[in-house]
Amino acid sequence: MYEESQDLLQKNTMEFIHDGIKYQWNEEECNYSVLPNDYRGEITIPAFIHNAPVVRLATDAFFDCAELTAITLPETLEEIGHSAFEACRQLKEIYIPDSVRQIGLDAFSDCTSLQRIRLPKSIHELPISMCEDCTALTEVILPEYVKVIESAFQGCTSLKQITLPEGLEELGWCAFNGCKSLQKIILPTTLRRLNNFAFSNCEQLRSIVIPEGVEYIPMGCFHGCTHLSDLVLPSTVVDINVDALNYTAWMKQQDDGLVYYNDLLFTWKGSNLPNNGHLTVREGTRIICDQALQQCRDLRSIILPNSIHRIGQEAFSCTYLQHIVMPDGLREIHSGAFMCCPHLQSITIPASVCEIGVDLFTGCEQLQHIEVHPDNPYYDSRNDCNAIIRKKDNCLVAGCCNTQIPEDVKIIGESAFMDQHTSKHLVLPQSLTKIERCAFCLCEDLEEIIFPESLTTVCDGAFDDTAWWEKQSAGAVYINNILYKYKPHVHSGECEPHCFVREGTTQIASCAFEDLTKPLYVILPAHTVEVHKNACAYAEEHVKILTQEEWRAIKP
C-alpha cells in the first residue's frame, strides 16, 4: 500500500519512509518528526527508530487522510503540529500521551467522526480551532492544569456537557460557539476572563453561573443562546456589553425600556422612547455600561441618580442628547462617553470625578460650556477656560468650540478637540510641550496655527483633516524641528523618489510616512535624529530611511 525502500532507512537521511510512515531526521536534536503522507487504516507510530525518539507530528502530518481510522501515538511524542489531524473524518477516538507539551492550531478540526478525546496533563493552553467542527464529539477530558481555552470547541454540535477544571483562567473568542447541544457547563472559581462569543449560539444552554472575579461580560458572549433564562453574574462584574445577551430567553423576558442586571444599566430594549425623549435611571444604579444607550438616538435628556459612580465607553452616543447633569458621587467617565452627541451644549464635571478617558466630546459640535467643580482635586477648568485640565501634568483632556487654552497647559490630550468646531486661527501657549494623537483631527475650520518653540512632540493624526493640513504643500511637513508627516501629491497620491530631511530636524514623528504606496528614500541629516519606531507604519516595504553614507552607496 505504501511506497517503501529499505535503502532509504538510514539515520543520516533527512527524509525517509519506514513501515508506511514518512519521517524526517533532525540532526541537531537527534530525533524524528512524522511528515505528511497518504495514511490509511490503523496506524501505530513507534517510540524509537534506530534508538532515536519520535517526538513530533509535523504540520499537516495527517491532514485530510480521509481513510485513517485509528492511530496510536508513542509516549515519546512532545508536539502535535498545526492541522496535524485536520479533516481525518473517519477517526473516532484519539489518546494523546502525557508526554505531549504542545498542540498546534486546528490540530483535530473537522474530524467529524471523532467522539472522544483525552488531552495530556502537560498542556496549559488549548489552541485556536483545536477541535473545531468535530460534530460527533461527545466526551472531552481536559487536563487539570489548563489555564486558557481558545476557540478549541467551536462548532462541536454534539457536545452536551463538559467539566472545566479548577485553575482555568480564561475562555477565548468563540471557545464554545455553536455547541448547539451543550446543556450544562460548570465554570471553575478560578475563571477570570471571558472573551467575545465564548458561548454564542449554545442553543440548549439553560443556565449558567459566572464565578466571582470575572469583571466583564463581552460582546456576543451569550448571543443566540435561545434557551438561556437563568443567568447568575458575580458582584465583580463592572460591564456587560450591549450585545452580550441578544437573542436569549433572559433578554426576551425583560420589559421594553432600560435593561438592568442588578445595579448595572447595560442596554435599551425597544424602539420608541417615551416622554418626548426623556429617561430617568433608577435609584441604586452604580454603573452605566459601555455603549449602553447608543441605541437611544432620540434621547434628549436623562436624569442620573447619585448612586452612579461609573459611565462606560461611548455610553451616550445619542444624536439628540441636549441635557445631562452629572451626579454627585460619579468617579469615572470612560473614553468616548459623549462621543457623537452633536446637540449637547453644556456639561459640568462633579468634584468626585477622578478618572476621565479620551475622546470624551468627539463630534460634540455644539458644545459651548465645560465646567469642572472647583472642589475637584484631580481636574479643573482654570480661568473659565471651557475645558477639562488634568492637574497632575497640566494636560488639557477635553475642550470645546469656546475653549481658551490656558498659558500653563503643557499637553493637549488625545482627541481633545477631535471633530469639533474651532476658530480658524489658533495660538498655542508657550508652555506647550506635547500634542497627543488626533488632538485636532477633523477640525475642518482650523486654518492657521502658531506653534510655540517649547513644543517638542507631535503625535500621529494630531492635525489630520484640518484646513491647516490641506494648505500644506506636498512633501515633508514640519512643525518646528519635527518632521510631522509626509504629504503625497494631492491628485496623484504619489511622492518624489527621495526626501532629504532638513538640517536641524530633531524628530520624525509616529506615522510620518504611513500608508505611502510608492517607493520613497528618506535621507537623514548628518546629526542625530530621533526616528519614531512607527514612523513608517503600513508603508515599511516602500519607505527606506537611510543615513547619508547609506544613500551615497546606493543613489542612482
Task: Write out the residue ranges for each language-model feature.
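Consensus positions within tandem repeat domains that build extended binding/scaffold surfaces
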Residues: 59-61, 82-84, 104-107, 127-130, ...
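Structural signature of tandem-repeat unit edges
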Residues: 1, 7, 18-22, 27-29, ...
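Conserved recognition-core residues within compact binding domains
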Residues: 32-33
